[in-house]
Amino acid sequence: MTPFRKLTSAETAALEALGNSAEDWSKVLVSEDFKPFQLLQSHLEGDVEIAAEARIVRSRVANYRIGTGSLVEGVTALECRRRSAFGNGVGVATMNECGGRTVKIFDRLSAQVAYVMAVYRHRPQTIAALEKMVDAYAEERSSEIGEVGSDCRIVGARFIREVRIGNGVEIDGASILENATLCDGARVGVDVKAYDLIAAEGSVIDNGSIVERCFVGESCRLDKGFTAAESLFFANSHCENGEAASIFAGPYTVSHHKSACSRSSTPAAARTRATTSSRAAPCTSRCTCAAASSPAAPTSCRPRSRAPSRWSWDTTPTTTTPRPSPTPI
C-alpha cells in the first residue's frame, strides 16, 4: 500500500496559488513524491487521498482515494456521501417483475450462481445460504470512502456518487453514476445514467444508455441508448437501441431491436399549406359557379354529395325521376 502523508504549509500555499481550495487541508493525504501541480482549480472535501502521479483538474472531490496515475478532470462531483456497499447486495427482480425471483448482485457474480438464485426458489434453504454469503460480502466491501483505481481516466462527467472504480476504468462524459462498482477495464461513455449497477471487467456502457439495478457482465456492451432495468447480462452480451426489463440474459445474448413508428414524411406545416392551397384552387373555365363572374365569390368548387362523380363542375341541380310504383297483381 502506498504510504501517505499530510501536506506541508508550503505545499498548501502552492496549491491555493494554483486556484485550489479545501474544506480542511489537514484531511488531505498525499504520496511521498507529491507535487502541487497535480491539482489545478479544484475543491476537496472530507478525507481525500491522492497517490503518485494522480491529477485532479477543475473538479470537486469528496471522500475519495485517487489511485496512481489516474486523471480526474472536469467532474462536477466525485463524492461519497455516506457509507456504501457500492452496488453489492442490491436485489434485482429478474425473470419476475414482482420480485419472486430476486437475485442479489455483487462484483463476483457468475451466471451459474445467478441461475441457482433465480430458478431454484423451491429450495429455500439454498437461497437463504447464498443470500447470507452475498450480504456478508457486501458488508465486507462497504466503506465511507470511495475509490478510484490506478491508471483511470475520468473526464467531463457530472455526478459520480458512491462508486468504486477499478483499475484502468474510463468514464467519459457520463451524466450520473450512483451506487455502483466499475470493475477493471470497464468503460462508461457519454450521457450514460446508471443507478445500483455492477459492471464487470471490460464491460462497456455508452451513448446515452440508462441502467438501473442491473448486473453487466464481463465484456458486455450496452450501447446506442439502450435502457435496462432489473436485469442481468452475462459475458459477451451485446444490446443496442432497445430496452430490457427483468431480463436474465445468459452469455452471448444479442439484441439490436428498435421499435419504429411510421408517419408521413411531409412536415405538418407543409401538409397544412398543401391542404389550404387545394381548397382554394381557382375555378376553371368549365365551372359555372358564381366565381366565374364575381371575384368576391368563393374561389373553389366543393364536392357534391349527390353528384355522379367525385367532383362536380356543373352546379345545375340534379333532378331525379321518381320510379313508378309496382302494379299490384
Question: What do these predicted regions represent?
Answer:
Residues 1-246, 250-264, 268-269, 273-274, ...:
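Domain-scale signature associated with acetyltransferase and cell-envelope carbohydrate enzymes
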